[in-house]
Amino acid sequence: MNIDTGEEKLQLAFRKGTIWRKIIVSKTVLASSNKVTELAGSGIAVTSQNARAFIQYISDMENMNYYLIPEKKSIGRFGYIPDEGFSPFVDGLIFDGDANFKAMFQTVRSRGSETKWLETAAEVREMSTTVKIILAASFASVLLEPLNCLPFFVHLWGVDSGTGKTVALMVAASVWGDPAVGAYVKTFDGTVVGMEKTAAFLNNLPFCLDELQLAKDSKGRTTFDVYKLAQGVGRTRGNRSGGVDLTPTWRNCILTTGESPLTGTASGAGAVNRVIDIECKSAQAVIKDGMRISGAVKRNYGFAGRKFVERLYQPGVIDQVSERYRELFRILSDRDTTEKQAMAAATIILADELAC
């Protein structure tokens, strides 16, 4: 049963040749002769001719073995789960979400040596303040929910090559899982709907996007809209049954890179307040020896994020974190800045203090 929606699903096991396969299917699909034929695409031999018999067979099997079939808790996203913990760090929790996100769900894991990752993180932190900021922002992503803060962007940009922007993004992603571009790190080459769904899937984990220039039109203008992700709420969309789909929501940090700023002279004040734009130049590289550093975090990743979350669940920690956040927010708000900018800066500083 999905602990977010309460929807029940069944795991079906079937054999193709000598190989057993498993698939998790919604009971809504298994109750409709029109929908159940979609399982043919997964390799199950169901057709429009035998659909009714197949549905009856599955129903009978479930009813006859109801007390023998184990019930598992499932989830289709990352992040905080009320009364349960933080996905995917909940024991016994299985993924039952969109099949397109299954591969990404599996990227959030530990691999290699925690000691080597810590050594690499300590080394890159000494290379530039920019690395400290984006690394801290990666941790800060999971603070937004308990602190009731809004999503915000940290964007590294620069026209010079070899500044280490992408490697810095990979270091930030390695806090949680496989930092390879195409694994946990995605690119701007996608649709608005796709980005909304990915943001909702990540939920409280950082959304890492590389290469802003991929989101430009034929005239070289950036088509990416900061507001689409910074609001933390997707569009309400209708469905075929005449109702509306569940409105996607998220509360995380969006970490990005590109050759140009994420905001410009034409951007509204609201967009500017939601983005921390950091220019990167080759004369002052964000990360030196990028090939070696990227290789190190590709081999060793996924340790720090879990430990950071586990610390937040310790008794009294959230209260202490909230008090420190309010203190930092007051200090920053007294300066020449807006509340949204102070909020983003306070969470980054706080995350850096907690992670060190």
Named regions from a protein language model:
Residues 248-250, 266-356:
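Phosphate-sensing "switch" segment of ASCE/P-loop ATPases
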